[in-house]
C-alpha cells in the first residue's frame, strides 16, 4: 500500500514538473524587420536662426519615439568643428511627437527649430530614437548648413 502511494506521489510530481515546462515563455524580442526604421534627408533649408528639415522615415515610422538634431559650429576655435574633421556634436535639439516643430505624416517627417547663429556655418545630423530600447538609433549622414544669405 505504501509503495502504491509513493508511486502515485512520484507520478503526480513528475506530471506537475512536466506541465510547468510546457508553459515556458521567453521575453518578447523586437522583430528587426518590422520594428526598425532608417532616416533619409530629402531637403533642408536655413532662414536666419531657423532650420527646416524634411526627412523620409523608411520602415516602421510608428516606432519613431523622438529625434535628436545633433550639430556643431564650424570654425577655427578649439570648441568648434571643421569640414573634414570627425563629427563631434556639441549640441542637440530634442524633438518629439506633439512638440512644435515635429510633424510626422505617414513616412514624411518635417522638423523645424530656431537655435542657430545666422552668420555661422554648422554641421549636423539627425538621429531617430526607436521606441524599442533594444534597437539602436537611426542616424543620417553628416550635412553642412551654410550661413543664411544676407537679406
Language-model-derived ranges and their functions:
Residues 21-63, 136-151:
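Pro/Thr/Ser/Gly-rich low-complexity, intrinsically disordered linker/stalk tracts
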Residues 45-49, 105, 116-120:
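Solvent-exposed loop and beta-edge segments used for protein-protein assembly and interaction
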Residues 55, 69, 124-126:
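An aromatic-rich alpha-helical recognition segment common to small helix-rich domains
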Residues 60, 74-76, 129-133, 145:
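Short coil/turn motifs at secondary-structure junctions
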Residues 65-117, 138:
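Recognizes extended acidic, P/S/T-rich segments that occur
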Residues 112-136:
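Beta-strand-rich modules
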Amino acid at each position: 500500500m505504501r509503495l502504491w502511494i509513493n508511486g502515485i506521489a512520484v507520478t503526480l510530481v513528475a506530471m506537475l514538473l512536466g506541465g510547468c515546462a510546457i508553459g515556458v515563455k521567453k521575453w518578447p524580442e523586437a522583430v528587426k524587420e518590422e520594428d526598425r526604421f532608417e532616416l533619409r534627408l530629402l531637403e533642408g533649408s536655413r532662414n536666419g536662426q531657423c532650420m527646416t528639415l524634411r526627412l523620409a522615415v523608411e520602415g516602421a515610422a510608428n516606432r519613431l519615439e523622438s529625434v535628436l538634431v545633433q550639430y556643431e559650429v564650424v570654425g577655427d576655435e578649439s570648441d568648434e568643428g571643421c569640414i573634414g574633421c570627425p563629427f563631434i556634436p556639441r549640441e542637440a535639439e530634442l524633438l518629439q511627437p506633439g512638440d512644435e516643430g515635429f510633424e510626422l505624416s505617414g513616412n514624411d517627417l518635417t522638423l523645424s527649430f530656431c537655435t542657430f547663429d545666422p552668420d555661422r556655418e554648422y554641421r549636423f545630423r539627425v538621429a531617430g530614437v526607436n521606441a524599442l530600447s533594444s534597437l539602436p538609433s537611426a542616424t543620417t549622414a553628416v550635412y553642412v548648413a551654410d550661413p543664411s544669405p544676407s537679406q
